[in-house]
From Swiss-Prot:
Cofactor: Mg(2+)
Protein name: Endonuclease G, mitochondrial
Entry annotated with the keyword Transcription regulation: no
Organism: Homo sapiens (Human)
Mutagenesis / variant outcome for changing residue 288 to D: Phosphomimetic mutant. No effect on its interaction with YWHAG. Enhances interaction with YWHAG
InterPro entries xrefs: DNA/RNA_endonuclease_AS, DNA/RNA_non-sp_Endonuclease_sf, Endo_G_ENPP1-like_dom, ENPP1-3/EXOG-like_nuc-like, His-Me_finger_sf, Non-specific_endonuclease
Family named by the database record: Belongs to the DNA/RNA non-specific endonuclease family.
Essential for deoxyribonuclease activity as annotated region, ranges: 286-296
Assembly and binders: Homodimer; disulfide-linked. Homodimerization is essential for enzyme activity. Interacts with YWHAG.
List of residues binding Mg(2+): 172
Amino acid sequence: MRALRAGLTLASGAGLGAVVEGWRRRREDARAAPGLLGRLPVLPVAAAAELPPVPGGPRGPGELAKYGLPGLAQLKSRESYVLCYDPRTRGALWVVEQLRPERLRGDGDRRECDFREDDSVHAYHRATNADYRGSGFDRGHLAAAANHRWSQKAMDDTFYLSNVAPQVPHLNQNAWNNLEKYSRSLTRSYQNVYVCTGPLFLPRTEADGKSYVKYQVIGKNHVAVPTHFFKVLILEAAGGQIELRTYVMPNAPVDEAIPLERFLVPIESIERASGLLFVPNILARAGSLKAITAGSK
């Protein structure tokens, strides 16, 4: 685990908050119970009118965007989760979902679900089932199907290929599955359990002493194989206290005998490695936060 933590050294970047206000509106329309995610703040963005003109330059941002902008963050709001898609890797940057006891029960039947392409993603940038065929990797859910038994549509949505990543079968079916089960079990102790899951592509120092970010790609669409996965659990107690549990696992076979707490890492490590920010959004609403790390109680 020391090596794992030492590897989490990528620079931090954009935050998680830009999507959550839209999520709040959609979930209110669906009469979902209020929770932490709906109260997280949207990150401030300067309005175009506030940008000073440059002498001799374009008359404003509108002129620069005359023929459109080549790419924007691809946010996807599903029945059961919100996802930010990365067209470069053919997968998600992160997926956010809310777990509650009543959502873990229902008529959702995994046998009625099939992995399928996400037609909302441009054909140039989407994964297909053919990419996984013969690759040796599982189609590993980010938002787990078992988290959303409350409706068939909610479970179906977890089978979009935009919500999966190439995952070593032993990890997917054992240690990672155990972490998903543990996440669900926390709904018995907490009022709301928010889960953010995503891939990591971590650097490794090689024989020449230099560090490189290297990862495999599969299929004709070059779907990126993460080196690691993270899972951030934001736990909201009935009294309003917020607890944070943050995990990283390598995309490799992991001995099931290793306790899950061995994979706890400081949230700062995930923020630096993923380019996401969690703590500022939480503190803006909660005011205080208890982070659980390995060895803490």
